[in-house]
């Protein structure tokens, strides 16, 4: 009887080996599931970026408003007969100088 129990334990151990450590083991399945979750997150980020770029391309193809906006903001272009005003912020630590009309200088 003792020999039969030992044989059954050895047989169960041999049957359990592929389940836990073999090619299609639970550990490998768990690892692959973790990789799938991570890849789905990356794919979602890339899809969002692609959708944004696609919308931008469609906008640029449809009208001149997007092209004009880009030319103004990124290239600093202005339309003909427009006047460009540039406001320069004061450097920190410098006192504000009064306008020339207030100081008496003309």
From Swiss-Prot:
Highest taxon above the source species: Bacteria
Membrane-topology descriptor: Single-pass type II membrane protein
Residue numbers on the Cytoplasmic membrane side: 1-3
Segments crossing the lipid bilayer: 4-21
Key words of the record: Cell cycle, Cell division, Cell inner membrane, Cell membrane, Coiled coil, Membrane, Transmembrane, Transmembrane helix
Coiled coil stretches, renumbered: 31-73
One GO cellular component, as annotated: plasma membrane
Cellular compartment(s): Cell inner membrane
Main location: membrane
Gene Ontology BP, a term: FtsZ-dependent cytokinesis
Topology, Periplasmic side: 22-106
Keyword Cell membrane applies: yes
Function noted in UniProt: Essential cell division protein. May link together the upstream cell division proteins, which are predominantly cytoplasmic, with the downstream cell division proteins, which are predominantly periplasmic.
NCBIfam families: PRK00888.1
Family named by the database record: Belongs to the FtsB family.
Subunit structure: Part of a complex composed of FtsB, FtsL and FtsQ.
The protein's name in its UniProt record: Cell division protein FtsB
UniProt organism field: Methylobacillus flagellatus (strain ATCC 51484 / DSM 6875 / VKM B-1610 / KT)
Gene: ftsB
């Amino acid at each position: 009887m003792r020999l039969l129990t030992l044989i059954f334990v050895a047989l169960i151990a041999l049957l359990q080996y592929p389940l836990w450590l073999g090619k299609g083991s639970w550990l490998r399945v768990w690892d692959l599931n973790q990789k799938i979750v991570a890849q789905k997150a990356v794919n979602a980020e890339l899809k969002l970026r692609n959708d944004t770029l696609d919308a931008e391309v469609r906008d640029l193809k449809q009208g001149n408003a997007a092209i004009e906006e880009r030319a103004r903001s990124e290239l600093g272009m202005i339309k003909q007969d427009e006047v460009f005003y540039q406001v320069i912020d004061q450097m920190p630590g410098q006192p504000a100088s009064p306008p020339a009309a207030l100081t008496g200088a003309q």
